[in-house]
Amino acid sequence: GVSSAASDVYKRQVNMLDIAAGGPGEFSKRPFLKAHISPLISPMRYGEDAVDVVYECIKHNIPISCITAAQAGATAPATLAGFLTQSLAETLASLIMVHAIKPGFPMVFSNWPLVIDLRTGAFSGGSGETAVLNAASAQLSNWLNLPSGVACSMTDAKAIDAQYGMEKGITSFAAASAGGNLIYESSGMTASLLGVSFEAFVLDDEMHSNTYRALRGIEVNEDNLGYNAIFDAVLGDGHFLGGHHTLEAMERDYFYPKLADRDEPKTWFDNGAEDAWQRARTHAKKILASHNPNYLSKKQDKEIRSRFNIL
C-alpha cells in the first residue's frame, strides 16, 4: 500500500507504476496496490486534502483503504462502546463518500480503534483495550458484510522482549479470532509505531503463522479420530511414534517455527544460549544477504531512476 495526504503525489506514483506495469495506463487496468487514506478526521468531519486524494485514487483506479483512526478519550469517547459508535459512523461516512463518487469502487472498511494512556497521553498500541476494540471492529465489519481492515499486533515495547511478545500476541490473536480480514501496523512495528525492526519482521512472521494455525482449528473426520491408530498402538508397540497416522498428521496438522526455541536447557546453553532477538537477527541477516529478487527489467529500472529522484 501507499499513503500520502497530497493528491499530486499519486499522479507521480501512477506514472512510476505504469512503467512497472508495462506502459501508460497499464496500472489502472490491473492495479496491484492500494492507497491508505484517512478522509475522516475524528471527531466526525471530512478532511479536504484527504477527500482530494480519494478523487485522485478513483480517477486512476487505485483501490482504497479508508482508515478511521480515532483515539479513545482524545478524538473519540473514552468508553469503548461510545468509541465504537463514533468510529463506525465515521468509517461508514467514508464508504458513503466513495460510493457517491463512484458506486461500487473497491474500498477496505478500515476502522482502526486506537487507545492512549489517559494518564500521560501516550499512544498505547499494545493495550488490552486495543485488542478488544479492534476485535469488535472486525466483528462489526463482518456484521455489515464488508471487507475489514484492523490495526493489531502493535506493541509499545522498544526491544524484542517479554512485553513485545505479550502485546503482539494478544492483539494478533484477538483480531484473528474476531474474523478480521486484513491487519495493519503489524509486522515489524515497535515502539508505539515509532520504530521498525528487521528482527521484528521475521519474529512476527512466525507469530502470525501460529495465529493462522490456531484459526484452522481441529478437523474432525473418521481418519482424524484415529481409532485404527489407537488400536494398533495399544495392541502393538504401546506408542504412536513413527506410525503412518502420526507422520501424516505431522505434515498436515502442525506448524514448525524456525526461530522459536524448543531445545532442552542444556542443548540451548551449549549452543550459545541465544534469545529470540539474537536468533531473529541472524535469520534476518541471512535473508538480506541472499534474497535479492528482481521484479523489473533493466530498461524499466533505468527509466524509473531517470524520471524520479531515486539513488
Regions found by a protein language model. Name each.
Residues 1-6, 10:
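Single conserved hydrophobic/aromatic residue that forms the stacking wall/gate
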Residues 4, 31-36, 181:
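Hydrophobic beta-strand segments of well-ordered beta-sheets in folded domains
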Residues 11-18, 46-49:
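Active-site-adjacent beta->alpha loops and helix N-cap segments on the catalytic face
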Residues 16-20, 56, 140, 214:
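Alpha-helical structural signal in soluble globular domains
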Residues 19-30, 56-60:
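Alpha/beta enzyme core
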Residues 27-30, 67, 102-109, 145-151, ...:
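Flexible, glycine/charged-enriched surface loops at secondary-structure junctions
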Residues 37-207:
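Glycine-rich anion/phosphate-binding loop at the beta-strand->alpha-helix junction
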Residues 199-311:
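Catalytic-core signal marking the mid-to-C-terminal active-site face
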